[in-house]
């Protein structure tokens, strides 16, 4: 219970928080995407369309940031977005929830980063952030802002020019547009609103989560087998006790009823202890990495509880029935 809950609910928590940050962070009226990449001049063309107040292209990629110190130092992957336009234009279509500094100075040699990365790298506004661009090039831009919605949007935000020459594909993947009409923007790519874009991203995240769920299922299955074997051996070791109960007048139904209550007690204690261990692990972990509490889907947690109770009941009842046959 503890192991499976920790693995599964860690992912559901991250997905739930990321989805919430994405929905709250995109303030654009329209989101234009294209799996093959948007036209090079997509942002310029969109900005010239009637009614458009701001159009910002995003080049999404990954960078590496050194975190820790001494023997505990390592390179941490961070989602990065290269912004076409100024920080002021970005603020019109994306709310990064800036905690320190300002996006107004965002530009060549200057970046904004998520607060979790700032804590991990022990840097703040005014410091230099050492990082490795996608092609391995080292850079040390100045941090001009620290924000809070990096999990749902991007951990590192920098100007597009700083990334364009260091990625395998220099085409923007997303275009955020404030104002204008979706019909006119359709010439640039697939147009949707914030809700539709967030739903699509959430679906992609759920499809990618199956590897985590599979690992949790396999490891949880091994733990369940060990627990079931323990319960089965415990019941078989009590064959004389069960026989004595039958000899003193207890009916087969009464003995099985007693064992069912015992299995219910064992499963309840296991669920409570497992939940407590998972909570003790998840709460500080999620608070430290996201600043929010873990998200536990009620139906998923209920299925874990039902599975624990069902396994305990079967592991006790089936061997008990076999042991009681000789006393029938």
Label for each model-derived stretch:
Residues 1-117, 127:
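Juxtamembrane segments of multi-pass membrane proteins
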Residues 2-3, 209-229, 266-274, 300-304, ...:
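Alpha-helical transmembrane segments of integral membrane proteins
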Residues 5, 9-13, 225-230, 276, ...:
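Transmembrane alpha-helix boundary/anchor motif
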Residues 24-27, 146-181, 192-198:
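Small-residue transmembrane helix packing/gating motifs
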Residues 100-162:
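Hydrophobic secondary-structure segments that place a key small or acidic residue at a functional site
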Residues 190-223, 236-237:
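Peri-transmembrane interface segments
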Residues 226-271:
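Interfacial "coupling" helices/loops that link adjacent transmembrane helices in transporter permeases
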Residues 269-310, 317-328:
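Short helix-loop junctions at transmembrane helix boundaries
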């Amino acid at each position: 219970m503890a192991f499976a809950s920790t693995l599964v609910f860690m992912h559901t928590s991250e997905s739930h928080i990321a989805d919430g940050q994405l929905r709250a962070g995109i303030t654009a009226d329209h989101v234009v995407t294209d799996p093959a990449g948007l036209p090079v001049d997509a942002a310029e063309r969109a900005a010239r369309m009637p009614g458009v107040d701001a159009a910002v292209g995003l080049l999404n990629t990954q960078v590496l940031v050194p975190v820790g110190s001494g023997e505990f130092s390592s390179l941490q992957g961070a989602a990065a977005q290269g912004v076409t336009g100024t920080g002021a234009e970005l603020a019109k279509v994306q709310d990064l929830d800036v905690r320190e500094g300002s996006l107004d100075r965002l530009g060549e040699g200057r970046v904004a980063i998520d607060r979790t990365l700032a804590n991990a790298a022990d840097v703040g506004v005014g410091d230099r952030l050492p990082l490795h661009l996608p092609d391995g090039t080292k850079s040390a831009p100045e941090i001009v802002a620290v924000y809070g919605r990096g999990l749902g949007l991007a951990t590192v935000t920098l100007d597009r020019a700083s990334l364009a020459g260091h990625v395998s594909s220099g085409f923007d993947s997303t275009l955020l547009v404030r104002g204008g009409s979706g019909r006119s923007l359709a010439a640039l790519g697939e147009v949707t609103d914030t809700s539709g874009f967030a739903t699509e991203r959430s679906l992609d995240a759920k499809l990618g989560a199956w590897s985590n769920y599979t690992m949790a299922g396999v490891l949880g299955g091994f733990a369940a087998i060990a627990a079931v074997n323990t319960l089965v051996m415990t019941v078989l070791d009590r064959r004389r006790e069960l026989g004595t109960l039958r000899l003193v007048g207890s009916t087969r139904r009464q003995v099985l009823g007693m064992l069912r209550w015992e299995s219910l007690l064992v499963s309840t204690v296991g669920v409570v202890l497992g939940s407590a261990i998972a909570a003790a692990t998840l709460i500080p972990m999620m608070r430290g990495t996201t600043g929010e509490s873990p998200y536990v889907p009620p139906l998923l947690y209920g299925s874990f509880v039902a599975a624990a109770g069902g396994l305990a009941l079967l592991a006790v009842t089936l061997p008990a029935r076999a042991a009681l046959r000789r006393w029938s």
